[in-house]
Amino acid sequence: MTLHFAYGSNMSRAVMRCHAPGAEPVGVPALANFRFLITTHGHASVAPCQARTVYGVLWRLSARDRVTLAAWENIAGGLYHAAMLPVRQAGQRRLALVYLARSQKQAAPQSGYMDVVIAAALEWHLPMPYIEQLRSLSLRRPRRLRAFRWM
């Protein structure tokens, strides 16, 4: 079993049911000294940033779910890469698999993407100031390439 820290659309129970159906939620941890951003492909990533914190959902993945989630995140194609990073949940430090975008160049979100992220943040009761930060990103003009689809 692997712990996975989700900070974007993978926080959503519905999204995870599609891409890692056996994933089990463990809790709501924080990733310290990182910031949330939207990259040029219109989806989320995190990047090192002192004194900032990213909140998300910790999922327990089976080996099979890890493979299907890696395919969805386009690890083989190089869109994201995997890293093991420390997250803190209820005062406990745990290492978790985190997907980081290869490109850290900021851009506007894909149309509809931040709606999924914000709904998931509300579903998991992430801190309201953090949700407001996410909402501010959703106010940027969305990319018109195509609407976000997670199925």
Regions found by a protein language model. Name each.
Residues M1-M151:
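Glycine-aromatic micro-motifs
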